[in-house]
């Protein structure tokens, strides 16, 4: 009889990949998108997922995918070289603005306080985008369902007010910034601060890369990622550093 425990360590080479049917693009209006999905999803563990991210994949809950669009290559996987990163003036200002915040690793579990912040963020920053109507179940499936090494980090003001939450995957060669949401009424570029904090965590953990997902030049929601340098892009199957 085969050792069933070996099934928990699915080699990357045995994964199967399939393309989804076309669906409306979330980032470029009027475009159709497709994704390449890694399967079987329930056997993708932390080590295998690290290899997938290195090949340009991301995850949404248990769904591990990368763009596979017809005649479009706008979505480019990007990662920051944590050791060599130097903040620009705007980023230094954001870092100073939120030094009073305290970060806590919390349980990756349902919390009414977290869901309330998520709802206010979506309604305040992305109204009409669809996610502003996410139910509790949709929220949990998106951010709380994982089979990899995931951390939920709370950022709180000195008085205890919840300002921001970052969901982060710990990989073999870095951190992957899954999603961040924050108080839309709080000034000072909290999203930028979150990325800077994650870069510092990479340095603390001696991990070389912070993976930021996909950069899309024509999407305002994604274009900001090019501001974090040195930045590498995954193009034609290889990581290449972008010009300064």
From Swiss-Prot:
Its EC number is 2.3.2.29. InterPro entries: Acyl_CoA_acyltransferase (IPR016181), Asp_Glu_LeuTrfase (IPR017138), N-end_Aminoacyl_Trfase (IPR030700), N-end_Aminoacyl_Trfase_C (IPR007472), N-end_Aminoacyl_Trfase_N (IPR007471). One of its GO terms (cellular component) is cytoplasm. SUPFAM superfamilies: Acyl-CoA N-acyltransferases (Nat) (SSF55729). Functions in the N-end rule pathway of protein degradation where it conjugates Leu from its aminoacyl-tRNA to the N-termini of proteins containing an N-terminal aspartate or glutamate. PANTHER family: ARGININE-TRNA-PROTEIN TRANSFERASE 1 (PTHR21367), ARGINYL-TRNA--PROTEIN TRANSFERASE 1 (PTHR21367:SF1). This is Aspartate/glutamate leucyltransferase. The gene is bpt.
